[in-house]
């Protein structure tokens, strides 16, 4: 796959109109475009997604099927979220819950978290854990924006080093789009501990 064949989609977990997460994702996607990819911002404000109910078919859950199809079409998915109470935002969790292995298994995923205060480590950790559970391959380079209200001025990054971290995520999203993850691991039947012996 050449860089010009790569499609990068970013899922924005913030519903705020003046979202720092959305601004950062737009910068990330611009960097991916400059690296040769086509890009798409999946703004969850534009999708009707009821709270996930496992008893409801995805086809009967508002725009869930349409969103899942857009995620499936991406070569790399970037998850972006503000940090709320030490984790990532519920709109993003709902969107991911309506997806699954068909959308995320063996997919390349980039992570971006934004916080109004301290470094959003736990939000990144929680997103990474969910991606692992879905057998996705997470780009080693993660992007985080602490103290978000001071990070931007008129929609632009104040700190060039922080902006570089965000644009690097966009470039890596293109660079790693065609990575072949290791085969799923399995417990060997030679492992006596696994057999209860």
Residue ranges and their predicted role:
Residues 38-40, 137:
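Conserved beta-strand segments of alpha/beta enzyme cores
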Residues 3, 138-197:
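Glycine-rich phosphate/pyrophosphate-binding loop and the adjoining helix
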Residues 62-134:
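Helix-loop-strand module that forms the ligand-binding subsite of alpha/beta enzymes
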Residues 2-37:
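N-terminal beta1-alpha1 ligand-phosphate binding loop
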Residues 13-15, 44, 113-116:
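Cofactor-binding loop segments of dinucleotide-utilizing enzymes, especially the Rossmann-like FAD-
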Residues 44-61, 153-155:
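N-terminal beta-loop-helix "entrance" segment that forms/cooperates
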Residues 12, 43, 142-144:
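Residue-level recognition of beta-strand->loop/alpha-helix junctions
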Residues 21, 25, 64, 89-92, ...:
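A general structural signal for well-ordered alpha-helical segments in protein cores
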């Amino acid at each position: 796959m050449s860089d010009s064949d790569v499609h990068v989609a970013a899922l924005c977990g913030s519903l705020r109109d003046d979202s720092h997460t959305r601004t950062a994702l737009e910068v990330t996607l611009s960097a991916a475009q400059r690296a040769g990819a086509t890009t798409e911002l999946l703004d969850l404000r534009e999708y009707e997604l009821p709270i996930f109910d496992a008893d409801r078919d995805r086809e009967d859950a508002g725009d869930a099927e349409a969103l899942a199809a857009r995620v499936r079409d991406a070569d790399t998915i970037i998850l972006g979220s503000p940090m709320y109470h030490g984790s990532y935002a519920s709109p993003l969790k709902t969107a991911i819950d309506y997806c699954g292995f068909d959308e995320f298994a063996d997919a390349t995923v980039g992570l971006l978290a934004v916080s109004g205060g301290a470094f959003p480590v736990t939000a990144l950790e929680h997103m990474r854990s969910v991606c692992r559970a879905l057998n996705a391959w997470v780009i080693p380079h993660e992007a985080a924006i602490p103290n978000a209200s001071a990070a931007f001025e008129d929609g632009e990054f104040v700190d060039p080093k922080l902006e570089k971290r965000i644009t690097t995520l966009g470039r890596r999203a293109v660079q790693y789009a065609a990575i072949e993850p290791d085969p799923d691991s399995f417990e060997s039947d030679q492992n006596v501990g696994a057999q209860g012996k």
